[in-house]
Amino acid sequence: MWGRVRRRYAAGPGRHPASAATLEEPGFTWPLRLTGQTPAGTEVTLRPLTLADGPAFQSVRRANAAWLEPWDATSPDPDAPSRTFAELVEQYDADARAGRALPFAVEVEGRFVGQLSVSSIVLGSFRSCSVGYWVSRSVAGRLVIPTSLAVTADHLFGTLGLHRIEVNIRPENTASLAVMRKLGFREEGLRPHYLHIAGAWRDHLSFALTVEDLGGETFTNRLRRLAGAGAETRAAQSSQQSLPRHTERGPASGGGAHLPF
């Protein structure tokens, strides 16, 4: 399990004339802690994964195995050894200190619920990175990952000075595709056989967001604006429902968050 989680964030663009970030770069710091709130006010924290997270990590992964495994990266080498949790934490820390990644644990109100990892960080003329994430089903639909992504993007663009964020998603992962589109990520096309997922090389749709796409707005403000617009739309739809008779179905329920992740 540990090896599969680690490899999930290993792939990314590497063919551009650029250089990796380092701890000497302005704004690049590790360990790093980022905090934010979902539009509903839930506290979300991004921080380094530590050895103390081992029991919670294992518990969450085990409880969500059936939900996560269709999207988990695997090794094309069936004999590749899995990493221990300690080795995973050590590799994450080494990658972060080398400026290659920002591998965050995601907490909701102090409880470990998943990971968001920034990988393939390059500067120079490219100034780009890739982002991957997973989250417990127990917090799906509460805008935990969109909030985590927004807080991280504001740090990457505003503090680290990156220009482009890329996210690659399997075409079958309709929930994540919907999130990318609602958040305004630009779909850049299909990457055939891009990552080894669930035992085979799988196609991925590539999405990207650049500083220009935000139009001077922070990502956090964009998320709050979109969430507010969704609430207004649902309220308007509800108010337009005619008064139900006994033989009619009543107004539709809210059905969860407007952004389905």
Residue ranges of model-derived segments:
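Generic, well-ordered alpha-helical segments
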Residues: 49, 60, 77-84, 98
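Conserved GNAT-fold acetyl-CoA-binding loop/helix
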Residues: 69-90
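A short helix-loop-beta-strand connector motif used in the catalytic cores of GNAT acetyltransferases and
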Residues: 77, 90-105
